[in-house]
Design a protein with these regions (language model features):
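Extreme N-terminal starter segment of soluble prokaryotic enzymes
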Residues: 1-4
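Conserved Rossmann-like nucleotide-cofactor binding loop
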Residues: 11
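Short acidic low-complexity segments
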Residues: 27-38
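Structural motif
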Residues: 43-45, 170
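Cysteine-nucleophile active-site neighborhood
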Residues: 48-115
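Pocket-forming structural segment of enzyme catalytic cores
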Residues: 85-157
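C-terminal and late-domain segments of enzyme folds
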Residues: 142-193
Length: 193
């Protein structure tokens, strides 16, 4: 079993790789189309901007490859954002795998933007209720709650903390920074998706 961690210009590649390897699964950081296509699992990590990630994927001709994958795919933070139609961040057109747009949080005295730190996540399906926990977030943008939302959190407004459409799973939080809760979430990705 191999996990392809797509190198799309993010900064959290090594921490995602270490989080995967805790599960005794080989993880390779790559932007090679064949390695991505042939991996058992694919992870789109994300730190940076949606526009930079999309440009990086486009320059490597990976967008259509990713959209055509049938194995489980996990998008983390911006990796989740790019699964949607658009992001308000630099008005970026994304991969259009999941219908909807990514919006920016409004800042006020009680809710700082970006959201940095631990937040309670509630999973919506009975088979994932054991994943309810606090997870680590670092985000200024969010997706509204839609039909494919499988977990929610709140930061000035309720928002999608995790989403699933077919073999594509996305999480707004960072499982690689979320300690035991993050390990359980990755276990769900590797064993239940």
């Amino acid at each position: 079993m191999t996990v392809a961690i797509v190198d799309c210009g993010g900064e959290n590649l090594r921490s995602v790789q270490r989080a995967v390897e805790i599960h005794k699964i080989k993880a390779v950081i790559t932007n090679d189309k064949a390695k991505v296509s042939n991996a058992s699992f694919v992870i789109l990590p994300g730190v940076g901007s949606a526009q930079n990630v999309m440009q990086s994927l486009e320059s490597r001709n990976l967008i259509e490859t990713i959209k055509s994958l049938t194995q489980p795919v996990l998008g983390i933070c911006i990796g989740m954002h790019i699964l949607f139609d658009r992001s308000e961040e630099q008005d970026t057109e994304c991969m259009k795998i999941i219908s909807g747009n990514v919006k920016k949080f409004n800042s006020d005295k009680r809710f700082k933007v970006p959201q940095m730190g631990w937040n309670k996540v509630t999973f919506l399906k009975e088979q994932t209720k054991d994943l309810d926990d606090y997870y680590y977030f670092a985000n200024s943008y969010y997706s509204q709650i839609i039909n494919q939302t499988i977990a929610t959190a709140e930061h000035s407004v309720p928002f999608t903390a995790a989403i699933q459409k077919n073999n594509f799973l996305g999480c707004q939080f960072h499982p690689e920074k979320s300690s035991f809760a993050g390990r359980k979430f990755l276990e769900y990705f590797f064993n239940k998706l």
